[in-house]
């Protein structure tokens, strides 16, 4: 059950509301939504951000504030995705602390000029096994368009594509742990 939600609407008309969202079992704060500059003829895209205060199994005196970002980038043009990434980096680079950035990036890691690689480099984020097999999230051709990226100080302990059909893409799930926190040395890492 996810009692805490934050939804940002990036495109709306009489027929639909498109956007991004975050769902959590735990309350979050500092939530905001950002819609990218319009990129006609495709619908507007954007991202939402919220912070969760995480205190793994009570092992820390004070919780760690982790920022979670849910994003949806343009599906049709690499140039638009790159512009959206630059817009997003301009905002997210000003946010301090650990970050988990996830969503539908509509791009892969394989190409030399990958927008995803560019984003990871700009924000110093890491992806889970970028060349791994069996993690496709779209279609029957093995396209991996949906990703989770994490900042230094966090690490993946589990990562999987959820086989349930909930949209035209499969969801991605990860277990993320706090890495090398001095208060956690000698004990199992906290997981989120």
Roles of regions detected by a PLM:
Residues 32, 69-72:
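Short beta-strands and strand-loop turn motifs
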Residues 65-67, 99:
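The start of beta-strands in P-loop NTPase/AAA+ ATPase cores
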Residues 20-22, 47-51, 70, 147-148, ...:
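Conserved hydrophobic/aromatic beta-strand scaffold that supports enzyme active sites
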Residues 35, 79, 83, 90-99, ...:
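Metal-dependent phosphoester-hydrolase catalytic domains
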Residues 15-20, 77, 108-111:
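Short catalytic/ligand-binding loop motif for oxyanion handling, primarily in non-cytosolic enzymes
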Residues 1-65, 160-163:
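Structured beta-strand-rich core segments of catalytic domains in phosphoester-bond hydrolases
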Residues 71-73, 103-105:
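Active-site metal-binding loops of divalent metal-dependent hydrolases
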Residues 53-58, 87-94:
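A generic secondary-structure signal
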């Amino acid at each position: 059950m996810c009692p805490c939600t934050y939804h940002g609407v990036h495109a709306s008309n009489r027929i639909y509301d498109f956007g991004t969202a975050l769902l959590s079992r735990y309350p979050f704060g500092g939530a905001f939504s950002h819609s990218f500059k319009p990129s006609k003829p495709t619908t507007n895209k954007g991202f939402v951000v919220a912070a969760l205060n995480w205190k793994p199994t009570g092992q820390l005196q004070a919780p760690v504030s982790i920022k979670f970002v849910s994003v949806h980038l343009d599906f049709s043009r690499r140039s638009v995705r790159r512009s959206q990434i630059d817009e997003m980096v301009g905002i997210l680079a000003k946010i301090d602390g650990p970050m988990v950035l996830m969503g539908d990036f509509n791009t892969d890691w394989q190409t030399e000029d990958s927008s995803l690689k560019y984003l990871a480099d700009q924000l110093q984020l890491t992806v889970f096994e970028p060349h791994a097999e069996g993690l496709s999230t779209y279609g029957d051709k093995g396209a991996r368009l949906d990703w989770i990226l994490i900042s230094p100080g966090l690490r993946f302990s589990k990562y999987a594509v959820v086989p349930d059909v909930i949209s035209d893409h499969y969801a991605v799930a990860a277990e993320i742990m706090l890495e090398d926190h001095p208060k956690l040395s000698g004990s199992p890492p906290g997981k989120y």
